[in-house]
Swiss-Prot record:
UniProt: Mg(2+) binding residues: 69, 71, 192
GO molecular function: acid phosphatase activity; metal ion binding
One Pfam family hit: Acid_phosphat_B
Main location (coarse class): periplasm
Top-rank taxon: Bacteria
Keywords, alphabetical: Hydrolase, Magnesium, Metal-binding, Periplasm, Signal
Protein name: Class B acid phosphatase
EC class (word): hydrolase
Catalytic activity line of the entry: a phosphate monoester + H2O = an alcohol + phosphate
Native source species: Enterobacter sp. (strain 638)
Originating gene: aphA
EC number: 3.1.3.2
Length: 237
């Protein structure tokens, strides 16, 4: 009889422990995890700069040629790219190789693009300095384009400072922007992508990173500051 009692006790104990483990495993993630001052203060070792600091660093220097990438640098152009994907290749990125998409994007769809405030501030600063403004984009070239007109209007660029957009295109294994930065003698180049920064460095120009908005359709988001370059604060919008 005692053996039976002990066996039953052991079985009950095992059942209780098993239920506790199951309950713990199925418990929901806490809704409020909390934080600490140390976590809140944690920052990546990035060389942050402001537009005012960039302007100050150029003080005393003669007017020069400066360049900007377009998409996610001065324009939040995801609406046009999103429409292009849905229209031409909903299940893939093949629309980026479709000339029909680029005809649409370069001839009107930037009317849906939102000018970034950092773009306004930077361009206004360089116009005030008397710099020559170039836009060098990885977009494919089309027979006609209204991007130059859109950018000039959106950012109030005087004709004396404005140059037509350079469509460098995209070629596998090649940074297509490098030759244009060299050819136009661009001294400062702003961009959101890694290849913008490396293109600038390849020609001895100052590459400055603009943050890509977290809701951009262009994924994955790049790691700003990964090359030790300057990164503009609050430049995601």
């Amino acid at each position: 009889m005692r053996k039976i009692t002990l066996a039953l006790s052991a079985a009950c104990l095992l059942f209780s422990l098993n239920n506790a483990v199951v309950a713990r495993a199925s418990a929901p993630t806490p809704l409020y995890t909390g934080t600490t001052a140390a976590i809140l203060a944690e920052q990546a070792p990035i060389h942050w700069v402001s537009v005012a600091q960039i302007e100050n660093s150029l003080m005393g220097r003669a007017p020069m040629a400066v360049g900007f990438d377009i998409d996610d640098t001065v324009l939040f152009s995801s609406p046009g790219f999103w429409r292009g994907k849905k229209t031409f290749s909903p299940a893939s990125e093949e629309y980026l190789k479709n000339p029909e998409f680029w005809e649409k994007m370069n001839n009107g769809w930037d009317e849906f693009s939102i000018p970034k405030e950092v773009g306004r501030a930077l361009i206004a600063m360089h116009v005030k300095r008397g710099d020559s403004i170039y836009f060098v984009t990885g977009r494919s070239q089309t027979k006609t384009e209204t991007v130059s007109k859109t950018l000039q209007g959106d950012f109030a660029i005087p004709s004396a400072n404005m140059n037509p957009v350079i469509f460098a295109g995209d070629k596998a294994g090649q940074n297509t922007k490098t030759q244009w930065l060299e050819q136009k003698n661009i001294k400062v180049f702003y961009g959101d992508s890694d290849n913008d920064i490396t293109a600038a460095r390849d020609v001895g120009a100052r590459g400055i990173r603009v943050l890509r908005a977290s809701n951009s359709t262009y994924r994955p988001l790049p790691m700003a500051g990964a090359f030790g370059e300057e990164v503009i604060v609050n430049s995601e919008y």
